[in-house]
Amino acid sequence: RESGVRQLERQLGAVARKVARRVAMGDTATIDDKVISSDEVRELLGRPKVHPERLAEHDEVGISTGMYYTPMGGDIMFVEASIRRGSSAPLKHDDGADVVRVGPISLILTGQLGDVMKESARAALTYATNNAALLGIPADRVASASEAHIHVPAGAIPKDGPSAGIAIALALVSEMSNRKVRRDVSMTGEITLRGRVLPIGGVKEKVLGAHRAGIKEVIIPKANEADLEDVPDEVREQLIFHPVETMREVLAIALVDQGRAAPIEVDELIGV
């Protein structure tokens, strides 16, 4: 989990020095098989200092699984949505959270979201409310909604970019329609007001992070199909990919009671 391998080199050096010290002191048990086990690595280097996200334990309403990448690598992230009903909420919360009005609904954004990600959240809410009937959202749920709260955990870490758009839209539709989201599906893609899914960057890193987290199926923009060629064969073979062009395709795949779209085999995607 770093840009390059400098820290990895340091840790390998630390392991080698500690093993050499044991050998010098007459303890050769560690190198009998010339292999150091994971338990011995923990003993030599201490507890892990990086704790990547793992697959959620249950399918839940209002929580979707997005994907992101940084120079340190890719990972999954959870997007949480909550809808409050009743009288209109104020445009400024006392806690300083970002609040904007989308029609009659106040949109609250927390989790240190950047400007581009905030715009994606607004687009996602507009799409969900404008297409409520088509998306299976009861009319009374939209009419009575006064506040939509989007939160992306790990609040101390700044987050930005458009690629969480479909994950935000999915969490909102799930919350407003009271339908669970599949926990084993992660996704990345920008959303438009009309529900189109646009291409994004970092597909390889995001897919590797999702695979490491235990994800089984990945939704990507159809325009990013060719980027799957960069994903190692051993990872591609263990995942099912769904290239999509519209948000309705995302919902058909990711909502538990919507049925599962037929998986697309990697060979069909990239012609290998």
Where are these regions (language model features)?
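The conserved phosphate-sensing helix
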Residues: 1-17, 73
